[in-house]
Amino acid sequence: MNSETPAAGPQQAQPPATLTIASRESRLAMWQAEHVRDALRKLYPACDVKILGMTTRGDQILDRTLSKVGGKGLFVKELEAALADGRADLAVHSLKDVPMALPDGFSLAAIMEREDPRDAFVSNDYASLDALPAGAVVGTSSLRREAMLRSRYPHLEVLPLRGNLDTRLAKLDRGDYAAIILAAAGLKRLGLEARIRALLDVEASPPAAGQGALGIEIAAHRDDVAAWLAPLHDPQTALAVEAERMVSRALGGSCEVPLAAHAVWRAGELYLTGRVSTTDGKRVLTAEECGAVVTVADALALGRAVSDELEAQGALDIVQALLAGSQAAGKGDA
């Protein structure tokens, strides 16, 4: 089974004796793992819940952008190996870092209630993007954010920004950048909300699919773990991110493509926006749909409707050109 959202678990799951959580070792990743650990300890007081900290290839390769070194899967492969060989029972991820299609043998057992999905503007000297002078250097790790900046603020210089959250803030503080764009959720989770000078409007800068949500991955055959995790699952968040991830999956999206997808609940309906851009920001395609979403199938259908609309506008031409360019660049780097 490789489904994105789990079936409902039993009402009473036999409490586990031990559980091991695989996590990256960055401060934010460990906060997320500890958040899940604490929730599990509250559910199962007698359970010995441990965290297995791991360094992934994505954490080790800091001199190149993700789009040039293998994409978001670099952050999860080592954790999946720990799930496969039994060193860990579950792995906690920022859902935006999870590839749109999981490898065979793995599934998302729970998607937790979402934090703020927006992008955050962080600067020591300027109050907003609009306040930045021409030529100011803005750092971002995301092609999606880069495309937005090049489209809306062509007078700014956009440069890559890699490293964990603390490393990125340190680079800002030592003057490498006039401002940086980060996910608001990570800053808030680490108690760094005061660093946020402005939150970017989701209409102007739609976030990445799954941004702000935590996903808990397991080996697909571990029905016992899925049952234990069922109380952590937030159905409304899950349906929203299912729709978002479907947009990206249908278009073949990855970190090589500036692709955004954001869903929000309004008056009982799910409103979904998808956006695909060229990296220079000169071509921006946007599609919006809404509907009553009750089941995973409904969410996937809504995501497919948005991806179909983007395809009709020429999104696949953009995606294929970007992927071809990325592959050519990769061959040159080898």
Curated annotation (Swiss-Prot):
The keyword Cell inner membrane does not apply. The keyword Transferase applies. Its EC number is 2.5.1.61. The modification S-(dipyrrolylmethanemethyl)cysteine is found at residue 255. Its cofactor is dipyrromethane. Pathway: Porphyrin-containing compound metabolism; protoporphyrin-IX biosynthesis; coproporphyrinogen-III from 5-aminolevulinate: step 2/4. GO terms for molecular function: hydroxymethylbilane synthase activity. It catalyses: 4 porphobilinogen + H2O = hydroxymethylbilane + 4 NH4(+). HAMAP family: Porphobil_deam. The porphobilinogen subunits are added to the dipyrromethane group. Monomer. This is Porphobilinogen deaminase. It comes from Burkholderia orbicola (strain MC0-3).
